[in-house]
Amino acid sequence: MAVRKPPITTREYWAPGHAACAGCGCAIALKLATKAFSEAMEEKYGDPNAFAIAQATGCMEVVSAVFPYTAWKVPWIHVAFENAAAAASGVEAAWKKLGIKGKILAIGGDGGTADIGLQALSGMLERGHNVVYLMYDNEAYMNTGIQRSSSTPYGAWTTTSPPGKYSIGEDRPKKWVALIAAAHQIPYAATASIGNPFDLVKKVKKAAKVDGPAFIQVHCTCPTGWRTPLEKGVEIARLAIETGMWPLFEIENGDIWNIKIQPPGGGAKVYKEGGRVVRIEFKKPIEEYLKYQGRFKHLFKRPEAIEELRNQIKAMWKVLGVEAILPRPEE
């Protein structure tokens, strides 16, 4: 009988027994990312363990390293909320001086990356350190009480952007850190999602193999902060892709005129010119994504807010060079 090879290594670097919430999308992301990283290290250096992790304070740090226990099965250092990129830069410089072959993986959430860690990240990218920075994006400061971050999407409820008579919730557009990273002319910048795990694995391996800095912004569902059913995390993340709320793209060597777009699926029609995606007609409205999430429930009483969100998503796709056609539920 033929034996099928697993699509990814069975080695574990993010071990079971951590304290993440049931249904945590970020835990899925880190499990897949560390497996993919080890495969890349084995292919590049002949050693699957040729990497170390520098991790910022945040959800995934808190749940993985409650002293004296840890879920990490790889050299790992916990640093402050804002300086995972700086610490990773130092480790990388030390490895280079000592002649150690391998790569550093820096990990931070959206608060520790898009907000208070942005300066350290920019410095790491600009200096050209051989580090992959993985931003797990659950779109708020979930660890400290579901406060809004600059990565929180427009209209979302958080404890610091509550909807009410004079508020629709978060009133700022989402910050796309992957585009900021790409502006540093680094070898590789991308977005990924637990809604497309094979794409996530492929991009982590690609980032790990480049010489120089790389950045990946990974969309992760959060049942606690998003007020979603525990069992629907991957399905909801997939809906974000299929409705246009979360684009999957990659930018190599800062070439923003040649952004590679991963087709969203979900029945969307994709049009290309010269091999480049220029137009996507989405079949599913963004309401299909919003309706599962308690953080957006108030928007269904404010159709003008949903329309504003739809316009912001179109504008984001325009930045990527793509005309996005986003249907309404009645269409």
From Swiss-Prot:
Keywords in alphabetical order: 4Fe-4S, Iron, Iron-sulfur, Metal-binding, Oxidoreductase
Q: InterPro entries attached here?
A: PorB-like (IPR051479), THDP-binding (IPR029061), TPP_enzyme_TPP-bd (IPR011766)
Manner of cofactor binding, per the entry note: Binds 1 [4Fe-4S] cluster per subunit.
A molecular function (GO) held by this record is: pyruvate synthase activity
Where does this protein hold [4Fe-4S] cluster?
C21, C24, C59, C222
Its domain of life reads Archaea
Asked if the keyword tRNA processing belongs to this entry, the reply reads no
Q: Which CDD domains match?
A: TPP_PFOR_porB_like
Enzyme class at the top of the EC tree: oxidoreductase
Task: Please state the Enzyme Commission number of this protein.
Answer: 1.2.7.1
Q: Which cofactor does it need?
A: [4Fe-4S] cluster
Reactions performed catalytically: 2 oxidized [2Fe-2S]-[ferredoxin] + pyruvate + CoA = 2 reduced [2Fe-2S]-[ferredoxin] + acetyl-CoA + CO2 + H(+)
* The keyword 4Fe-4S appears for this protein: yes
Q: Which NCBIfam families match?
A: PRK11865.1
Q: How does it assemble?
A: Heterotetramer of one alpha, one beta, one delta and one gamma chain.
Protein name per its UniProtKB record: Pyruvate synthase subunit PorB
Record the organism.
Answer: Pyrococcus horikoshii (strain ATCC 700860 / DSM 12428 / JCM 9974 / NBRC 100139 / OT-3)
